[in-house]
Amino acid sequence: MNFNYKLDNEVLIVSLEGRLDTEAAVKFETELAEVCKANAHSALTVDAAELEYIASSGLRTILKLAKTEKNFKIVNVCSSVYSVFEMTGFARIINISKALRKIDLEQCEKIGFGGNGAVYRVSEDEIVKVNYNPATDAELNSELAKAKEAFLQGVPTAISFDLVDCGNGYRGVVYETIKSKSLGETIQNNPELMEELTDKYIAQLNLLHSIHTANPVFGSMKDNYRKQVENASKHLTEEEGKMLEMVLDALPEGDILVHGDAHPKNIMIQNGEMLWIDMEGMSAGHPIYDLISVAAILSGVRNDDKMTMAICGMDVATVLKFRQCFVKKYFKTEDPEMIQRYDSMIEALRLIRAVFAIGFNSQNTPQMRPLIIQVARQAFFPNIEKIVGAVKYLVNTL
């Protein structure tokens, strides 16, 4: 077996090649000890991309490293070697990650896009959601974990498979292909089904919100909003930052499972069944967080049909009709006065989502931020008492 090493920002990276059998393990342990002694480091990473085999003696060498090195991990492990780590329990006590499957995006059809990436069709049965923003790569692992756990909790979701290497430093998550259209697109193409589909959509929201969870994989939705306030406040006056804090204070913690971006393009219809997609924001919280995300699209996007279609699958006119239908059915009222009252609250929630976007971690945020701040100063901050009041009322009502 051969190995080489390099020091990168105090991380000692050791690359293995060949077979770590009994003879090789003794030699490797001795030589690596000298390398570690001669190169001051704060972390040790073993790159096992070219490691073909590991014997029990090799495992013991790895275990010694895990015990003596403060920040130790093994990356790019092939399937056969990873299975050894799994069977022996090493994968439970050491930070070990498998080599990612590689996908060539040039051979895939681009079928969608978003703030931090795009969606490509890998095959008839698989799509890959690619992240173009390396700063948020860590969120991909979180998204995969959330998608799998939500499925196990009984949430109707697209089945997630694995994390993949998409080339050029990009990572992605592979999902099953949903052979149908989104709820938004279905309503757009079948307006006569709007009422029926809205009923089913609300039933899916209620099903999701019937699930209580303490699983740490989901995290707190209020914490997510808190981070947005912290980021947004850097671009606002002190007084404006305090107004965002007023909204944050009115938003509750909770243990109810919420999607975080529950608009009609994030729910697909396949063989009559509605399935949630894009679950990176799924967290524990309160139904108002999903109502905020729905409200965000209920006026269309800047009265622009093309942009509105891209975001939620419907044109502006259809969105406005859907808004009326949704408000009546979600709040279970036919009273015109109550409908108008709830509609004004939806507008307040829409403004919250828009203004909190000042603190989003998206590639598009820097160019959009000046416009959002302008809108905030025209419509949000002057009406802060009304907006906070709407939040408090809905928190107690939902």
Where are these regions (language model features)?
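Amphipathic alpha-helical interaction surfaces in cytosolic regulatory modules
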Residues: T22-I94
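ATP-binding pocket architecture of kinase catalytic cores
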Residues: K110-P216
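STAS-typified acidic loop motif
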Residues: M1-T30, A48-E50
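Active-site acidic catalytic loop and adjacent metal/ATP-binding pocket
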Residues: I111, A118-S123, E245-Y289
